[in-house]
Amino acid sequence: KKYQVIPEDNMAPVKSKLDFVNALEEFLDIWKQHTLILDTIKDSELGILLSEANMKETRDRNPQLSLLQLEKLLNTRIASRIKFLCTEKEENEKKRKLQEYRNYFHSAKNKWTEPQIYREFLLWLMKNNRLNNNDWEETLCHVKKGRFDLYDTAALCLIWKRILKKKDADEFSQIIIDEAQDFGVMIYYVMKQVLDTCYFTIMGDVSQNIRYETGMNDWEDLKKVLFQKE
């Protein structure tokens, strides 16, 4: 499917701010919690494969992983546990158990897309009257048509990073940005999250901000984003 990048819509002054991307992070965290049920996995023949505490520890120690990546890791651990517990069993029995628990965690079957999750997020904002603004109809309308402004596109990138990313890809080692003041701080937040091993050189002059409502009029929020404690 083809998508189109469009000029900033009327909600861009809201979408460009940290409050918007923080709300998106909250929504994606809820999405992950509702999807990834980490109850103890107990087999009637082999006993406990993975405990709730063990899986939650794995999740908490790997905050950089997307939902799909975390599911893959947990599935790998289930398979390893089965192989260990079946050490003295027949090969066919081990294969049967591995097949039984293959893709135990498998939200990929839902075939979610970034635009779909983004639409759900916008509806969530409206339903819960978040950000003191409920006027998301315009954004919803063009998103449904596959048309996204700069800040919608950044939101899609964060959704990919948190939910749908399947494997790590080659990343840039350094990115240099000039005239940084012309874009909202949420852009830099998303870049920092998606390119988490990259070095950024950011230059600009807030007195020359040509997009007063969406750009940056000071560096304070940007400093919070780039120098946040890990």
For each predicted feature, which ranges?
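Generic hydrophobic, helix-prone segments enriched in Leu/Val/Ile
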Residues: 24-28, 157, 179, 198
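Conserved helicase motor core of SF1/SF2 NTP-dependent helicases
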Residues: 2, 130-145, 160-174, 181-230
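P-loop NTPase motor core
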Residues: 2-40
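Conserved helicase NTPase catalytic core signature
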Residues: 31, 35-174, 184-188
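Alpha-helix initiation and N-capping motif
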Residues: 21, 153-156, 219
